[in-house]
UniProtKB/Swiss-Prot annotation:
It comes from Prochlorococcus marinus (strain NATL2A). One of its GO terms (molecular function) is rRNA (guanine-N7-)-methyltransferase activity. Keywords: Cytoplasm, Methyltransferase, rRNA processing, S-adenosyl-L-methionine, Transferase. S-adenosyl-L-methionine binds at residues 85, 90, 108-110, 137-138, 156. The gene is rsmG. Its EC number is 2.1.1.-. It comes from the Bacteria. Its main location: cytoplasm. Transmembrane segments: none annotated. This is Ribosomal RNA small subunit methyltransferase G. One of its GO terms (cellular component) is cytosol. Specifically methylates the N7 position of a guanine in 16S rRNA. It is found in: Cytoplasm.
Length: 248
């Protein structure tokens, strides 16, 4: 075995040990194919710089699945997920690979990115379980096809958690859970989020801090439960959640 392959295998084992889950041969092949397709498509459109080696396996795959550690212990269970702002397909496609009985909706407002997501889903054999939607979260959250229809609504947050929560909560069914993936997390952010969630008829179920392997830093996951049906006025019109965020 070459040195590169040994290092790659050791890195993979570290990730699977961290997750307490390991992919089947088919799932591993799907992840490898996904990596190849990302590299190919990156030449056409700017998707992500995290496509090589540890960048892909730790900062993309592991970062997508580690917050779902509990769900990974029972990957056979069927759930409906929606990934908001799916971009290059993480965490949504990683979840679809790891959870073979679940259905995933990938939502992004960029038609270039959703074209990529559709092609990749088909190429790696997931198009029967992945639905790709080109729409803003504020619009999709009011669409009766999607509203109150998911077990999990997920986002790797770029915006503040109180803004992201307004995008996610309207998608949840009565027992659903919103998951916000964050890097750092503070008590101030927690208090602002609590106030925002009160307006959305939701609450923080818990927060959990993870340390990514291979010195990739700290991640926080915020799990949110609905306490009642999300008020009909949310999400507000396009741009308003960012311009006038809840929680203040």
């Amino acid at each position: 075995m070459s040195t590169d392959k040994k290092n790659r295998t050791a890195s993979h084992l570290m990730i699977w040990n961290e997750l307490k889950w390991a992919p089947s041969e088919k799932q591993l092949a799907q992840f490898i194919h996904l990596q190849e397709l990302l590299k190919e498509w990156n030449k056409k459109i700017n998707l992500t710089r995290l496509v090589d080696g540890d960048d892909f396996w730790t900062a993309q795959v592991c970062d997508s699945l580690l917050p779902l550690y509990e769900e990974l212990q029972h990957p056979e269970v069927s759930h409906k997920y929606i990934d908001i702002g799916s971009g290059c397909g993480f965490p949504g496609i990683a979840i679809a690979i790891a959870m073979p009985n679940s259905n995933i909706t990938l939502l992004d407002s960029s038609s270039k990115k959703t074209t990529f997501l559709k092609e990749v889903s088909k190429e790696i054999g997931l198009d029967s379980r992945i639905k790709v939607v080109t729409e803003r979260a504020e619009e999709a959250g009011r669409n009766p096809i999607f509203r109150s229809n998911f077990d999990y609504a997920i986002a790797r947050a770029v915006a503040s958690a109180n803004v992201v929560a307004e995008y996610l909560v309207p998608f949840l069914n009565s027992t659903g859970q919103a998951l916000i993936f964050k890097g750092s997390w503070s008590e101030t952010e927690q208090q602002i989020l609590k106030k925002a969630l009160a307006e959305l008829n939701a609450e923080i179920q818990r927060t959990h801090e993870f340390i990514l392997p291979n010195n990739r830093g700290i991640r926080n996951i915020i799990r949110i439960n609905s306490t009642n049906k999300c008020p009909h006025q949310y999400p507000r019109s396009i741009g308003k959640p960012k311009k006038q965020p809840l929680g203040y």
